[in-house]
A protein has these predicted regions:
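Ligand-site clamp/hinge motif
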Residues: 199-244, 369
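Alpha-helical secondary-structure segments
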Residues: 102-109, 135-141, 181-182, 208-210, ...
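Gly/Pro-rich hinge or "lid" segments in bacterial periplasmic/extracellular proteins
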Residues: 154-206, 210, 220, 324-325, ...
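Detector for C-terminal structural segments
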Residues: 27, 197, 285-313, 350-360, ...
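A structural "hinge/loop" feature
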Residues: 33-49, 72-74, 99, 149-158, ...
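N-terminal lobe/hinge region of extracytoplasmic solute-binding protein
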Residues: 30-80, 111, 178
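Surface-exposed binding/hinge segments that line
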Residues: 77, 88, 122-165
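Aromatic- and charge-enriched surface segment that lines or borders ligand/interaction sites
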Residues: 74-117, 133, 139, 225, ...
Length: 507
């Protein structure tokens, strides 16, 4: 039935499309996600951030393996206490609107981040002041030692925007980004974003003319587009359709390990979910292996700590066992033997919706019931960000969440999601989890640049968090993408984003 449906989709796409794509070097990227904003300082989703990185650049960045590399800065130094970081800037670079990139441009961007009003302001929370040393040198002076600061500077949330464009557009910069990157923003029509080649790019022009990012949340439709030649790259590649894709001689599969962890967000302001025994019961009641196999096509591994295994300072805790009897006993002990109702929230890409449906069915076994509310990815995160800790009537939700620890450091896998200071709108602790000891250990991990001390702090933090079950622990993705064989140079990154700078399309 699924194969017949895909065949019909292919025929329809071929009919609607007319002639195949010409040699104008235009790439269509079909994704399950929808761009939420193109303001890097006010964006929290990985998909939007990856598009932003094609347009804008930071002082530092990451390579294919999430190792920190210099970009708009050519070098940096820091003092022994890790409280001062000095960056030498590249000369001769201009933003797409002709504005010079220099120390003043850095000052404007960092001041904006330090305002505390934006979703990525927490990246610059350690900064006391930014000193403009000269036209091509800046110095960050921190309030206290912050061992992960270089990783924070490399984060997509610290990309540089044109000061002139910021002055012109204000908050509307989210629909009109102006950076220094290999691509220039072209248009945002409906849910589709288009970028075009920057002919004056400081590292030399890219080899494609345009890239169009088109949201296609239904898995089969994405693959059908690729096979029909109406997309050259799709992400994610639906794992359940892998055999079908592999049989197509025009399609090439890409698989990479990721740092994207999937979990259930619990609104701990809702009394039943505030009880650690209930949260533990939910973890015992979820058959993670079944969800991985059926909803994720096997392209994942069970979470065995609060952060993925390829993050700096990870420490294995052991996957949470599947034990419905234990779950029922904990529900009874907590006084919820008869269960309670919740609202299941999820983005609508088919694998996430299927996973949420499976969670819904599994939790019925311990009396937790409720309807599913699905929506596009951007609306899902808007909804979570709209809740507040002091809401008079907390929404009893369980949400299908995901997080990419995109600095590559344990700090970014824990602090934005689980620190008390990270309640919305400050950051992404959407479940309002709060624990004093956890907060102290998070700060201990930031208080030094000494790797041994940081490792110990984050090990203790993971050990403390794991039994508290602030989330429903699920799994860590393997990244699956697919592309046409005449495209090269676009590849998925461990954080769930992608790189397009090396894109090349042959005849």
């Amino acid at each position: 039935m699924l194969v017949r449906r895909l065949t019909l989709l292919l025929l329809c796409l071929a009919f609607l499309a007319g002639p195949a794509w010409s040699a104008s070097k235009d790439v269509i990227y079909a994704s399950e996600s929808t761009a939420k904003s193109l303001d890097p300082h006010d964006t929290t989703d990985t998909y939007s951030g990856a598009i932003e990185k094609a347009i804008c650049q930071g002082l530092m960045g990451f390579d294919k393996d999430l190792k920190v590399i210099p970009l708009l800065a050519e070098s940096y130094t820091f003092n022994p206490n890790a409280t001062e970081f000095t960056f030498k800037l590249r000369k001769g670079i201009k933003f797409h609107d002709g504005t010079p990139f220099n120390a003043e441009a850095v000052r404007v961007n960092i001041a904006r981040l330090m305002s505390g009003k934006l979703k990525r302001s927490s990246l610059m929370k350690p900064v006391k002041e930014l000193v403009v040393v000269d036209e091509h040198t800046v110095k960050f002076v921190l309030n206290e030692p912050f061992g992960a600061f270089i990783n924070a500077v490399a984060h997509p949330g610290a990309l540089m925007l044109s000061p002139a464009a910021l002055a012109k557009f204000g908050d509307a910069i989210s629909k009109s980004p102006v950076g220094t990157g290999p691509f220039i923003f072209a248009e945002w029509a409906s849910d589709t974003v288009k970028i075009k080649k920057n002919p004056d790019y400081w590292r030399g022009p890219v080899k494609v003319d345009t890239i169009t990012f088109r949201p296609v949340p239904e898995n089969g439709s994405r693959l059908a587009m690729l096979r029909a030649g109406q997309a050259q790259y799709i992400f994610p590649m639906p794992a359940e359709l892998l055999k079908l894709a592999q049989a197509d001689p025009k399609v090439e599969i890409i698989e990479r390990p990721s740092i994207v962890e999937r979990y259930l967000v619990f609104n701990t302001r809702y009394a039943p979910l505030a009880d650690v025994r209930v949260r533990q019961a939910i973890n015992y009641a979820i058959d993670k292996q079944a969800i991985i196999r059926i909803a994720w096509g096997g392209a994942a591994s069970e979470a065995d700590s609060i952060i993925p295994s390829n993050l700096q300072f990870y420490k294995k805790q052991g996957a949470w066992p599947y034990d419905v009897a234990k779950a029922k006993a904990l529900m009874k002990e907590a006084g919820y033997e008869n269960g309670f109702k919740v609202l299941f929230l999820t983005p609508n890409p088919s694998n996430r919706l299927r996973a949420t449906e499976m969670v819904q069915q599994q939790l019925k076994e311990i009396g937790i019931t409720g309807e599913i509310q699905s929506m596009d990815v951007a609306s899902f995160y808007n909804k979570l960000e709209g809740h507040r800790a002091d809401d008079p009537t907390p929404v009893p939700f369980i949400g299908f969440g995901g997080w990419s620890s995109s600095t590559g450091d344990a700090d970014w896998g824990i602090r934005p999601l689980l620190a008390t200071a990270s309640f919305p709108p400050a950051s992404s602790n959407f479940g309002f989890f709060s624990d004093k000891k956890v907060d102290e250990l998070i700060q201990a991990g930031l208080a030094t640049a000494d790797p041994a001390v940081r490792r110990e702090a984050y090990a203790r933090c993971q050990e403390t968090l794991w039994p508290l079950a602030p989330w429903g622990y699920l799994f860590v993705d393997n990244l699956l993408a697919a592309k046409s064989k005449n495209l090269k140079g676009i590849y998925p990154l461990p954080d769930g984003g992608f790189s397009v700078e090396e894109a090349e399309l042959s005849e």
